[in-house]
């Protein structure tokens, strides 16, 4: 939980310093409608603030209290056994494709009219994105988002912070493919 308000968490309330006053707006709507409707989906990033075990305990407490959302899940909870195999197969296909494309991409890594080639600067990112842990992680996340969208079903809307992260596109696509409603 990066940016978690630890004081509120100690009281069983989920409050992110990232979302700030949006929590109050969502709570007001829930009170007006008589029930919580927000489904919180967390993507785990290692952080010094809390261990994974502590994060799970907080998530469980937020679920028990039920004050700030209808559900609280980590993305990885939606990975099924078959998703692991499908993601691994997709990752292997990307590995093979990147190796085939690399011989064509390497000479193309320059601006038009320039002979300065940027391949030496980008080759590590290329390899990590297609053949490394990041590539496999993205394949797993893509499967998990599709599973989440299917499980969540139609929603009023899906909202996420626009930080230009690869997972944002995956969430958007999964929600649209599942017909879950608008994405903001």
Regions picked out by a protein language model, each given a short descriptive name:
Residues 1-184:
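Catalytic-core helical/loop segments in enzymes performing group transfer/polymerization on anionic/lipid-linked
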């Amino acid at each position: 939980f990066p940016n978690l308000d630890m004081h509120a968490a100690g009281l069983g309330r989920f409050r992110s310093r990232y979302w700030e006053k949006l929590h109050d707006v969502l709570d007001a709507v829930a009170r007006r409608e008589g029930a919580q409707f927000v489904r919180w989906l967390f993507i785990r990033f290692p952080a010094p603030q809390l261990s994974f075990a502590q994060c799970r305990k907080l998530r469980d407490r937020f679920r028990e209290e039920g004050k700030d959302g209808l559900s609280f899940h980590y993305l990885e909870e939606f990975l099924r056994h078959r998703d692991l195999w499908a993601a691994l197969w997709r990752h292997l296909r990307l590995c093979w494709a990147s190796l085939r494309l690399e011989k064509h991409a390497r000479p193309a890594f320059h601006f038009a009219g320039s002979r300065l080639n940027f391949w030496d600067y980008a080759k590590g990112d290329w390899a990590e994105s297609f053949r490394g842990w990041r590539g496999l992680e993205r394949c797993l996340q893509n499967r998990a988002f599709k599973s989440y969208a299917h499980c969540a079903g139609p929603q009023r809307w899906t909202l996420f912070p626009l930080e230009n992260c690869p997972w944002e596109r995956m969430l958007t696509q999964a929600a649209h493919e599942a017909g879950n409603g608008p994405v903001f």
